[in-house]
């Protein structure tokens, strides 16, 4: 699916992650900022890309500012950002959940 608009979900509070999703041209490009990037960066990127793949989003620029979010929070914020970016806020895609 193609991203229709730039969307944001989450905060920069402790134990959260802020995901900004915008149009991309060459696959899914994740720009991650995190204090725990060295230990958990690969897992954070995996959760984001796996979630976007479930939405069939193949081209996107993702800006992720992590403040110690758990995988379930990362997935929830990515789902919200993707739904907003695709203009599907009112159409819940249960298969993604």
UniProtKB/Swiss-Prot annotation:
Its main location: cytoplasm. It holds the Pfam family ACP. Signal peptide: none annotated. Keywords: Cytoplasm, Phosphoprotein. It is found in: Cytoplasm. It comes from the Bacteria. The modification O-(phosphoribosyl dephospho-coenzyme A)serine is found at residue 14. One of its GO terms (cellular component) is cytoplasm. Oligomer with a subunit composition of (alpha,beta,gamma)6. Belongs to the CitD family. Covalent carrier of the coenzyme of citrate lyase. This is Citrate lyase acyl carrier protein.
């Amino acid at each position: 699916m193609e991203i229709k608009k730039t969307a944001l979900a989450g905060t920069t509070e402790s134990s959260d992650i802020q995901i900004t999703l915008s149009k991309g041209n060459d696959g899914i490009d994740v720009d991650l900022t995190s204090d725990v990037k060295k230990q958990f960066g690969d897992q954070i990127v995996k959760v984001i890309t796996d979630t976007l793949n479930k939405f069939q989003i193949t081209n996107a620029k993702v800006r992720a500012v992590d403040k110690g979010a758990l995988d379930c929070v990362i997935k929830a914020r990515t789902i919200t950002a993707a739904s907003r970016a695709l203009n599907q806020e009112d159409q819940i895609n249960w298969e993604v959940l």
